[in-house]
Curated annotation (Swiss-Prot):
It comes from Shewanella amazonensis (strain ATCC BAA-1098 / SB2B). A lipid is attached at C24 (S-diacylglycerol cysteine). It is a lipid-anchor. One of its GO terms (cellular component) is cell outer membrane. PROSITE patterns: PROKAR_LIPOPROTEIN. Belongs to the LolB family. Monomer. Transmembrane segments: none annotated. It is found in: Cell outer membrane. It comes from the Bacteria. GO terms for biological process: lipoprotein localization to outer membrane; protein transport. The lineage of its organism: Bacteria, Pseudomonadati, Pseudomonadota, Gammaproteobacteria, Alteromonadales. This is Outer-membrane lipoprotein LolB. Keywords: Cell outer membrane, Chaperone, Lipoprotein, Membrane, Palmitate, Protein transport, Signal, Transport. Residues 1-23 form the signal peptide.
Length: 207
């Protein structure tokens, strides 16, 4: 198990502030191009840049966040202010690989890999939906006056997601500020850029 306190010290060493890291995207096997979509759910693929803060049992992890999400591949990268990668999670149809603190771990399940990071569970399967304002099947949802999700309670009751602000990115409304609360952790997410992507061969991004 990866100790969160050790990971926190590694992440925050020498840091006094955070700034968004640009240009850290990866090149997927299939060429992708930016597209506009009406809703986030219309995007077959997307990339996100923002900031992440995790608090748990007195520990705190702050990092820049880059996330590339496609039907066949995914990459989640956390970096320091100086651009140093402190966590890299990659996933394809063959399984997942986690690189952290100079070590590499592999598993068929990305969820099991991240569960080893600390005593709490980061909901990696649900996050791509919640971070784009989409409840999952069975979730309890409270809507705001514009009929956008304001509060989402996961189907198992373990997570509460509060969306405090929205923005328009790639033509679609997506959350800007989220707070995910669990009995063992609080996760704050800030989305600075969200870009819908489609195959460069002509797909328009709609499913």
């Amino acid at each position: 198990m990866i100790n969160l306190r050790r990971f926190t010290k590694f992440t925050l060493a020498g840091l006094t502030a955070l700034s968004l890291l640009g240009g850290c995207s990866v090149t997927p096997k299939v060429a992708l191009q930016p597209v506009s979509v009406e809703n986030a759910s219309d995007a077959k693929a997307w990339e996100l840049k923002g900031k992440l803060l995790i608090r748990t049992n007195g520990d705190k992890v702050s990092a820049n966040l880059f996330w590339l999400n496609t039907p066949d591949n995914a990459e989640l990268r956390l970096t320091s202010m100086l651009g140093t990668t402190v966590l890299l999670l990659t996933q394809n149809r063959d399984g997942a690989t986690l690189e952290v603190d100079g070590k590499r771990y592999s598993d068929l399940s990305p969820q099991r890999l991240l569960d080893g990071l600390s005593g709490f569970t980061l909901p990696i399967d649900a996050l791509p939906f919640w971070i784009t304002g989409q409840p999952m099947a069975g979730d309890e949802v409270e809507f705001d006056t514009l009929n956008r999700p304001k509060t989402i309670i996961s189907a198992d009751g373990e997570w509460t997601i509060n969306i405090s602000s929205w923005q328009t990115q790639s033509g679609a409304p997506v959350p800007r500020m989220l707070e995910l609360t669990h009995a063992s952790a609080v996760i704050k997410l800030q989305t600075n850029e969200w870009q819908a992507l489609a195959n460069a061969t002509g797909s328009k991004g709609a499913r």
